[in-house]
Regions:
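Acidic, proline/glycine-rich short linear motifs
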Residues: 40-68
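Small/aliphatic-rich secondary-structure junction motif
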Residues: 3-51
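Glycine-rich, Arg-bearing micro-motifs that act as flexible, cationic patches
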Residues: 111-133
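General small-molecule cofactor/ligand-binding pocket signal
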Residues: 36-38, 85-89, 139
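Short secondary-structure boundary segments
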Residues: 9, 112-114, 142
Length: 142
């Protein structure tokens, strides 16, 4: 049924990441799908303005840290190496996730979400944005 499952994760949110990965892994095992784990490092205009001169250094350090943590996560997933991949990108989580889903031709996105609170109702959440803008099916795991 599914060939490629995209699992966007926030490696700093261990509980959400774990729930989404477990769910996606169950689906991948049942369907023979490949998993692609994606971590998006958001770029806030405040960070860019505050550190404009050292932006590349900050970006490089964040990438190295994320690469290490994401690699450890992928290594812990019990799936053959040819069925799991990962990537890191910079930008708006919603835009990067929907763009990556298109690029890898994902037929399912599995994303973790917290229970909504007043902030997410007023401002929206990454999960809500992905559900709204993705061209493929999205499974939100709570």
């Amino acid at each position: 049924m599914y060939r490629t499952i995209l699992v966007p994760v926030d490696i700093s949110e261990e509980e959400l990441t774990s729930k989404a990965v477990r769910c996606a892994l169950d689906i991948a095992r049942e369907t023979g799908a490949k998993l692609h784990i994606l971590h998006v490092l958001p770029i806030s205009s405040a960070i860019i303005n505050a550190y404009a001169l050292g932006y590349m250094e900050i970006k490089d350090k964040a990438t190295v840290k994320a690469e290490k943590e994401l690699s450890m996560l992928v290594d812990s997933i019990d799936l053959p190496n040819d069925r799991i991949s990962y990537s890191i990108s910079f930008g708006s989580p919603r835009d990067e996730i929907t763009s990556t889903a298109d690029e890898i031709e994902a037929d399912l996105i599995v994303i973790g979400s917290r229970r909504p609170n007043i902030t997410t109702h007023l401002l929206g959440s990454n999960s809500a944005g992905i559900v709204r803008y993705a061209k493929t099916s999205v499974l939100v795991v709570r």
